[in-house]
């Protein structure tokens, strides 16, 4: 006898989803101690955290691929929240890194376009969190550039312009925003948050998670624990506990 026939299947369990969309800082976020891994751990049995980070990508490319990642479907397929975290590559200096560089005005327009696309597939602004690029430690990043045989291709002051543009898009569109560029420089030497001047160190991952979680928590606080706690499973007939709606 098939397993489903023997026990009765119950309704399919559909996990809510949190989608992280961004560049390498998102792609690497599932490494040990990463901010994405911390989110997944915090939300286990409540929500799947999907990593859709693409190392080296800018908003021009992100805008093109977003419709391939999220399409209009039934309400159960709609992510409970989406983070959009770009700017580290867009803000590269045009003369030194023309492939990744995106003009400031286009960067803002691309962010706005992505927020508008999400709205068109029934993900409203209140489910979207924009994240500004992190500050750049120029001395550390220049060392990496020299190793790769190139000149310093980013400046923190320029990154700040892109961070401000991200803040303005969030204000215009009505989304939440996490201003990492400002927060990381607020009280101490921010270089400790960065492993190579650009990407996050363990301390930087912890910093991002601690500031992002309150924004995420507002959007997932009503999610129940999926399936009962083990002590609450009916001993004689576990099917009574395990084939219901799982809201325990």
From Swiss-Prot:
Pfam families: Lipase_GDSL. This is Isoamyl acetate-hydrolyzing esterase 1 homolog. CDD domains: Isoamyl_acetate_hydrolase_like. GO terms for biological process: gene expression; lipid catabolic process. The active site is at residues 24, 196, 199. The record marks 56, 89 as: Transition state stabilizer. The modification N6-succinyllysine is found at residue 63. Keywords: Hydrolase, Lipid degradation, Lipid metabolism. It comes from Homo sapiens. It comes from the Eukaryota. Its EC number is 3.1.-.-. Probable lipase. Belongs to the 'GDSL' lipolytic enzyme family. IAH1 subfamily. One of its GO terms (molecular function) is identical protein binding. InterPro entries: GDSL (IPR001087), Iah1-like (IPR045136), SGNH_hydro_sf (IPR036514).
